[in-house]
Amino acid sequence: MIKDYFKIDKNPKKGLLPLEWAMLGYMAITVITMLFAFTKVVNPESMLWGRLRILVITLALWGVYRMIPCRITKMVRIMAQIALLAWWYPDTYEINRMFPNLDHIFAGWEQDLFGCQPALLFAKAMPWAVVSELMSMGYFMYYPMIAAVVLYYFFCRYYEAERASFVLLASFFLYYLIYIYVPVVGPTFYFDAVGVQDIAKGIFPALGDYFNTHTNCLPTPGYTDGIFYQLVEDAKEAGERPTAAFPSSHVGVSTICMLLAWHSRNRKLLFTMLPFYTFLCMATVYIQAHYLIDAIAGWISAVVFYFLLMAASKNMRCK
């Protein structure tokens, strides 16, 4: 019943939610990293102020929940932390830009494993408008898939809503930690910096701190007049940075979404998401956002993160 979501909880949770603690843990680790390398951080003041604002938002929403302890105010707390990922993602670039780029290593591994650069060849092999739009559609559906899983658990499986949200958010922060300390930018940035012709010849130079001052990338391959193509381009212009390539969190988190859908035993949810998930995974290489090894690492890491976090949260239940 809808009214249940506005009913005052008789035994409200007094402290922070586990996903809020996960955020604070990530915040603490990044602040410590910044302090150790403070002289190299480009925008330390804005980064610290941003963290302070997030802390204030978190505590303010906790205060609202304490005043009006119901399911809706708890959902607002959860959705706020998920929405704030849009701030945390580009923030990874502000930290990892201090470290030497590692794309030459990963592009070399890609060449050794597959004898080519799949990110260069995939779109060329399938340049058709229909394929391009399906790929862009899948890539665009990343955040809607996350929202669908969170909202499904909240409205249809409430007793595990807090757990599912924790697994998703903690997974994001684990990926973000990897991105900070393993600075890989992906084909669209690295190939643009080196030159596609040299990449095709198997030339993968080390670029050091090049991406500390350069953020140019290749134009996305595909059908440029497509609706979903334009939506993906708009998203790139709004928040894309030379960061977060290995492992692919698009593949990883969407895989965790699929595992949570499987855990819910709702076949309709699982099979509705399946085609979007399939195209999303393919799109990561098609649009040159990731190397193929990034996608493979995304699948492997997703399974590891999912089962570790599900085990850690097995006693997490909402009443």
Where on the chain are the PLM-derived regions?
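N-terminal transmembrane-helix/juxtamembrane module of multi-pass inner/ER membrane proteins
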Residues: 1-54, 72-146
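Aromatic-anchored segments of alpha-helical transmembrane domains
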Residues: 27-36, 84-91, 172-180, 277-286
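Structural signal for the C-terminal ends of transmembrane alpha-helices
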Residues: 61-71, 151-159, 261-265, 307-313
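Interfacial segments of alpha-helical transmembrane regions
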Residues: 75-80, 147-183, 188-202
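Membrane-interface loop-to-helix entry segments
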Residues: 131-145, 241-262, 292, 296
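Membrane-interfacial alpha-helical segments at the cytosolic side of multi-pass membrane proteins
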Residues: 148-153, 251-270, 300-309
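Membrane-interfacial catalytic/cofactor-binding modules of polytopic membrane enzymes
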Residues: 181-263
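Interfacial helix-loop-helix junctions of multi-pass membrane proteins
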Residues: 186-189, 245, 279-305
